[in-house]
Amino acid sequence: MQNQRIRIRLKAFDHRLIDQSTAEIVETAKRTGAQVRGPIPLPTRKERFTILISPHVNKDARDQYEIRTHKRLVDIVEPTEKTVDALMRLDLAAGVDVQISLG
């Protein structure tokens, strides 16, 4: 696996879950002897929704909600075979979306 790189992108609504998952990935990769760059925090996407409270009139009565999507990026620069096996066996939290690309 010489001259290869594994790029891992993580997305989650809860920043504690994503930080815990990135810490597990970094610790697993370092334990198997790979070189790690990151975790790099990417911009947080904020979606805001405004909803009318009243069913009929009172346009001034509104509630505002927000969903934040936190993102992190981890690069594993020199992965070994043990690194790939350990990452495949890693069990992460259910609220974290993981995208892995080889480059």
From Swiss-Prot:
Indicate what this protein is called per its UniProt record: Small ribosomal subunit protein uS10
| The keyword Ribosomal protein is annotated on this UniProt entry | yes
One Pfam annotation reads: Ribosomal_S10
Give the matching PANTHER family: 30S RIBOSOMAL PROTEIN S10 FAMILY MEMBER
A GO cellular component annotated for this chain's UniProt record is:
ribonucleoprotein complex
At the highest ranks, the source species' classification is: Bacteria, Pseudomonadati, Pseudomonadota, Gammaproteobacteria, Enterobacterales
- What is stated as this protein's family in its record? Belongs to the universal ribosomal protein uS10 family.
GO BP annotations of the record are: translation
Name the gene that codes for it. rpsJ
Any one Gene Ontology MF annotation carried by this entry is: structural constituent of ribosome
Organism, by scientific name, is Pectobacterium atrosepticum (strain SCRI 1043 / ATCC BAA-672)
- UniProt-listed InterPro entries: Ribosomal_uS10, Ribosomal_uS10_CS, Ribosomal_uS10_dom, Ribosomal_uS10_dom_sf
Q: What does this protein do?
A: Involved in the binding of tRNA to the ribosomes.
